[in-house]
Amino acid sequence: GKEGIGSGQHIVFVTGEEYYRSEEGMSMFAKILSQRYGYDCTVLFATDKTTGIINPNISTYIPGLKALVKADLMVIFARFRELPDADMKHIVDYVNEGKPVVGIRNATHAFRYVKNKQSPYAEWTFNSSKWRGGFGQQILGDTWVSHYGKFLQEATLAHANAKHRSHPVMQGVPDKIFCRTDVNGVNKLTPNENVLFHAQVLSGLN
């Protein structure tokens, strides 16, 4: 990255989902953070191992996860990944070190083990009973529960929660944000979780 407040800090973006073009959005986000604020950014993609072409529909391969060894922050925007143990270990080791994690959208269900249920990391699956709720519930606060609103049919208007308007994350953020997606439901919030926005599901996508 260029000179800026983020100089010397390394952010690794882990992408891989089929609906929201995380491979595009996170690349643009990383460029902003790198060029305007000085962060060193690495963006990793779901990739076809045979062709080397980025393909979010490939759920079993995200090359370059070793970059997490020297990461200061992991941003994960992924859905239903089932990675080889050697690759998944980098994510697990990073989290187990207690380093910060930002999960976006379907990161609550970033992992789903279907083929290799004997993997030592199968408990990270979104509906795990052994490690209740897997990565989503244990690390991000909740796993995937349901869609709130009709999936791919209804949009959302997010309203800032006045109670937390002074939260550092909310600096420069407008009071209302329109999203051309529905939202995900949660079962229960813990006392340690702060709701920064409340979602209002709209009729239609406009």
Where are these predicted regions, by residue range?
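Short linear motifs at secondary-structure transitions and domain/linker junctions
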Residues: 17-19, 48-53, 77, 132-136, ...
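Nucleotide donor/acceptor-binding cores
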Residues: 9
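Catalytic beta-strand/loop cores that center a nucleophilic Ser/Cys/Thr
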Residues: 34, 40, 58-59, 69-70, ...
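A glycine-rich, often tryptophan-bearing local segment used as a flexible ligand/cofactor-contacting loop or short
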Residues: 76, 81-171
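Helical hinge/lid and interdomain linker segments adjacent to catalytic or ligand-binding clefts
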Residues: 2, 12-14, 18-111
